[in-house]
């Protein structure tokens, strides 16, 4: 009898098409889905030049134009890669015992590999909004439940989406990891398997992530303007903190819809043309309620199978799609001109 698919099944690999992985990765992560991708980031680093000033040899007086001339202002960010790993470990007996519809609802290999892909995806999607430090939350309150357990309340409840049962955490500068035993997603509280030694206001990291993660929007568009000691991928952005480090607009004293229009006007003043604004679901709900019957919804399509529902607002340089993203920090909106943003990776990410 010839070797056939039935007898050789144990040696065959589970096949994942690019389309399947894309669907798993993008469906709940709008910014990750919508940002342009460059997947050939080889070599040691990548030089990203930016022109932030034009020649200043100009005057109504020729002699002054000549004597005051300057060259164009250029700086180059030197990008480097970050690694991130997600492991799926499956005992061979489990793989064999779960094969076929009669033996299990889901084959073990598919179940666990899908989970690892989702873990890597969540890490990347969260990091795209981060500053590179790896912080996924801040301790708001801490209580020792027993001699061997700590109950941690997050400073921002909405950050609870960044945490999972079984996750190993570090707090502040400590390198001893503690595991999450249980989570209350309504209150932003989780219980650890041991006393953490953490204090309030300390940042929280997945074990091994501190200062090792991709630099996302919070790094490229910092909430505080870069100062004289700034060094960001080899660039001191303080020479023009707006053109090299983005625009900061404080709309905390304004109604949300007015804050967004004000931010759009501020970006337009600097020559930008924002077309998408990412916000947290909590803030998106506030915007829906504030607009009431005036709300105008828009569907943002990434491909025929993946799309997101947003709200359309009108800025001074055109319509802006406000899209909710669970990975965006609460109380922060990122208003972007999408054609100037790109995710660089060595192969597909994740």
Where are the regions a protein language model picked out?
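Core alpha/beta structural scaffold of self-assembling particle/tube/pore-forming proteins
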Residues: 1-57, 68-70, 76-89, 93-350
